[in-house]
Amino acid sequence: MKFIVKPHPEVFVKSDSVRKRFIRILETNLRSIIQRDTKGVEVINRRDYIEVSGLDGTYRNQVLTAVTHTPGIHHTLEVKQTAFADMHDIYEQCLEMNREIIEGKTFCVRVKRRGTHPFTSIELERYVGGGLNQAVESAKVKLKNPDVTVKFEVENEKLNLVIARHKGLGGFPLGTQEDVLSLISGGFDSGVSSYLHIKRGSKVHYMFFNLGGPAHEIGVKQVSHFLWKKYGSSAKVKFIAVDFEPVVAEILEKVDDGQMGVILKRMFMRAGGMVAEKLGIQGMVTGEALGQVSSQTLTNLRHIDNVTDTLILRPLINWDKEDIINVARDIGTEDFAKTMPEYCGVISKKPTIKAEKLKLEKEEAKFDFSILDQVIYDARVMDIRAIEKESQEQAPEVEMVSELGSDVVVLDIRSAEEEDESPLIIEGVEVKHLPFFRIATQFGDLDQSKEYLLYCDHGVMSRLQALLLIENGYKNVKVYRP
């Protein structure tokens, strides 16, 4: 078995040199992701597609996850590759694979062919289709809108029988576009906007303005690491945390109430622009949508943009909130966003929807900009790959357990979707499911006379959640790592 990875069609409208470069980058990205956790799997550039071979049942799911979550891929064909003697041999192999699939249904046959053969693609389609129609009495040929399309490819002396077709993310390979800096809060909007730029081929670095203490920062680190791990782990990117509480305190003390929201956003953009310039990044990404809150009117957005020369990208500018939430659900960030605290919206009681330049400048004249310079100077810059390591170092008091006694409860903190895909069943041990986003509010409702071992797939989320629980006074918490 092998995977035939088809780049997104937009790649093929590029010039020959650009197309080759894009596919080469996609090949490198896939190899980096796939060979990190597998052995013996080969990733080969076949010019117009990428072949992933050397698979067995052990690595099939890991590779499938990689090709369906890597930007720049339109679709992937999961194929069984065999040799063939002639058209009749091809027909017999197709019949063996598709007999049960087409029983009682309408079907057609579609062939792609490369190389020199004594038959054309249409001749082969007619031969195989006619044979299937005769061999399976309950099946009927229907060339338009059939129930089943029997697909296969003939590549020189090899026959690729298509087992399944898996949709890809689309977009451009990661790293083909310039880097961007996402101003991420952990909510629905910033997570989706970050994903859209990953999908479009930009390496996304994350910048977080902390207004809510350690718990908020841990939450945003979790969603940033999740996005990177799931969609962009072939890239080395940074996570920048800025303690913005001194800036907020200065605004609350000195700035007129109605101007606070816009001025806070202007401070965000100033800070982001300063960091972007240091990192050589040309654009900042925000999750702002037109009219969603008072600071996001056209007038206010214009005043916000004017404080920096760095390009500000707003991929969600015309999106409805419902559509944003739907995408967050699809990409896996909805559960993070549901419980992520949002602080910016409550900074002003009577926010202006049409700020005036002179008023803003008058209020900002009261602001001590050395505070902004200091928080940027003190910003913590880290490789996003270090978040997993940091979670271990920050929580050395969290005991790691690999063997279980019968008197403990394993707390599966994965999302419902992850639990459904691979349920955690441990013979003789009680397993409860409490998603990570409900830990803070519902852990206290559990029987505190018992010991709880938190479990997630990679151990990052479980360690971070254990740290939060211990900081809140719970002593009956450990991490389960089988």
Curated annotation (Swiss-Prot):
Transmembrane segments: none annotated. Pfam families: Rhodanese, ThiI, THUMP. Its EC number is 2.8.1.4. It catalyses: [ThiI sulfur-carrier protein]-S-sulfanyl-L-cysteine + a uridine in tRNA + 2 reduced [2Fe-2S]-[ferredoxin] + ATP + H(+) = [ThiI sulfur-carrier protein]-L-cysteine + a 4-thiouridine in tRNA + 2 oxidized [2Fe-2S]-[ferredoxin] + AMP + diphosphate; [ThiS sulfur-carrier protein]-C-terminal Gly-Gly-AMP + S-sulfanyl-L-cysteinyl-[cysteine desulfurase] + AH2 = [ThiS sulfur-carrier protein]-C-terminal-Gly-aminoethanethioate + L-cysteinyl-[cysteine desulfurase] + A + AMP + 2 H(+). The keyword tRNA-binding applies. Residues 61-165 form the THUMP domain. SUPFAM superfamilies: Adenine nucleotide alpha hydrolases-like, Rhodanese/Cell cycle control phosphatase, THUMP domain-like. It is found in: Cytoplasm. Residues 404-482 form the Rhodanese domain. ATP binds at residues 183-184, 265, 287, 296. Belongs to the ThiI family. Catalyzes the ATP-dependent transfer of a sulfur to tRNA to produce 4-thiouridine in position 8 of tRNAs, which functions as a near-UV photosensor. Also catalyzes the transfer of sulfur to the sulfur carrier protein ThiS, forming ThiS-thiocarboxylate. This is a step in the synthesis of thiazole, in the thiamine biosynthesis pathway. The sulfur is donated as persulfide by IscS. This is tRNA sulfurtransferase.
